[in-house]
Every structure is written in structure tokens, then in C-alpha cells.
């Protein structure tokens, strides 16, 4: 772990100096090393290299590049730029479906987040994770899961 610490710190410092396509792998690497606060900060970073820039430029879908003018022939509706979706669902909300049909909840919602709510429909069930008043709740089809979080 001590050998990888400088690499993780370097990645956190550099942020999204990579293209949009590699952003998923950067977010995933940070999450798998327990750096959920960094993942959250990168998701909401306000630089020219982030999804906030796409919103600033009027995006209603994800761009191929971080901004319209950053690539001469950029697509303004590109699937690889949707990296936040699985990262938010799996790493922040912690919704993990098993191949057998079960679900484990392992949320990693940063302390700085006062309110969080996500609900997603998969496998004919609705999975919900909410953080409010400092407490995290998970539910399947509206039934609270008893696991302490």
C-alpha cells in the first residue's frame, strides 16, 4: 500500500487531465483504493475538464470531450462520457447486484454530502439509497434493508 500511495496522490492532484474516455478508470481506481471523497470532488469539479463544464456549455447529453471546442469533431452525445452513472451507483451509493439476483449495499457517501438520494430500477426491482440527517438508508422496492450503515 505504501508503494501505491504516491501514485494515488499524483492521480488525485492531476484530476481529469486525461480525456473523458479514461475518466471512468480514474474514478474506479480511486474508489477501489477507498478515496471516495476524491471521486466525489472529481465528479463535481468545476474546471474545463469535467462534467460541470459540459453542463455550463448547455449539455443535455454527455460530450465526447470535456467541452465543445476541445476536439474539432467532437460528438455531443457520446456513451463513454456517461462514466459517472456506474460510479455513482456502484461506488458512491454502493449498490452491488450479484449474478444470483441478490443485492449488497455498501455505500460510500462522503461526509461532506448532507443529502443524497438515488433510486434505480434493475431486475424488476427498485433499489434506493438515501443519506439524510447523517443516516444512510437502503431499500429494495421500498422495504428498508436492516443492514447497519
Model-identified regions with their sequence ranges:
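Short, structured coil/loop segments at alpha-helix boundaries
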Residues: 1-4, 19, 136, 141
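Long, well-ordered core segments of solenoidal/helical folds
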Residues: 2-17, 34-54
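Solvent-exposed loop and edge beta-strand segments that line ligand/cofactor-binding
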Residues: 7-24, 70-80
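Well-ordered alpha-helical segments within folded domains of soluble proteins
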Residues: 19-31, 81-90
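Non-catalytic C-terminal accessory modules of carbohydrate-active enzymes
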Residues: 40-149
Amino acid at each position: 500500500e505504501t508503494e501505491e500511495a504516491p501514485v494515488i496522490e499524483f492521480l488525485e492532484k492531476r484530476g481529469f487531465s486525461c480525456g473523458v474516455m479514461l475518466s471512468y478508470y480514474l474514478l474506479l481506481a480511486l474508489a477501489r483504493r477507498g478515496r471516495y471523497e476524491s471521486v466525489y470532488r472529481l465528479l463535481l469539479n468545476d474546471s474545463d475538464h469535467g462534467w460541470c463544464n459540459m453542463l455550463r456549455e448547455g449539455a443535455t447529453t454527455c460530450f465526447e470531450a470535456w467541452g465543445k471546442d476541445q476536439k474539432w469533431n467532437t460528438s455531443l452525445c457520446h456513451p463513454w462520457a456517461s462514466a459517472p452513472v456506474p460510479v455513482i451507483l456502484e461506488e458512491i451509493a454502493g449498490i452491488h447486484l450479484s449474478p444470483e439476483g441478490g443485492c449488497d449495499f455498501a455505500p460510500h457517501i462522503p461526509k461532506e454530502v448532507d443529502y443524497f438520494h438515488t433510486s434505480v430500477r434493475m431486475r424488476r426491482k427498485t433499489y434506493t439509497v438515501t443519506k439524510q440527517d447523517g443516516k444512510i438508508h437502503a431499500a429494495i422496492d421500498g422495504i428498508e434493508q436492516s443492514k447497519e450503515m
